[in-house]
Amino acid sequence: WQSTRKITWNWQSLGDLQPYMLNFLENHDEQRFASDFFGKDAGNVFAALYASLYFNRASFMIYSGQEVGERGMYQEGFSGKDGRSTIFDWYTSDKVRKLWRYIHGDMKALDRKDVALLERYRSALTQATGNRAVISGSTYDLCYCNLSSDGFCVDRHFAFLRDCGDDTVLVACNFSNVDAEMEL
């Protein structure tokens, strides 16, 4: 992982363009989060998901199968076993086929781990689309004022507020692989 300081740098460099950008964690050019080449486990995605989904008003994209932990570890078409999922080789992964069956009533198509991941994605998206602060609120990066706060690691933690009138949401993202308690 890179330092979470780059998140602050990124939004500051985008300035007024930020609401017009597309936020995403995966696409056909990038290695899948759950692949052996990147995050190795789809369950490690949530700090990145919450930061990408809740930080600003830009649109957010979930790429095919991401919500059930598609790993992209197939050697299909013109692509090697590279942790990516091609869109050009008319290929559908097992996870995407199982997700389709699950959505269409085959409740045994996905295993429990995939269902839990799907439900967590669903919950995050439902919260984001149902909260006025997330939909249209202002964003306040809290990292600069927590550089010396107890438990806050400036290279592994990212915290921000979304605020709109009486609705305020505090989001604290832990990008490390150990649990953390932080004072903000």
Where are these regions (language model features)?
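Core domains of carbohydrate- and sulfate-ester-processing enzymes
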Residues: W1-S13
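Helix N-cap / beta->alpha transition motif
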Residues: W1, E183-L184
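Loop/helix patches that line or flank the sugar-binding groove of alpha-linked glycan CAZymes
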Residues: K6, G15-N27, R32-E183
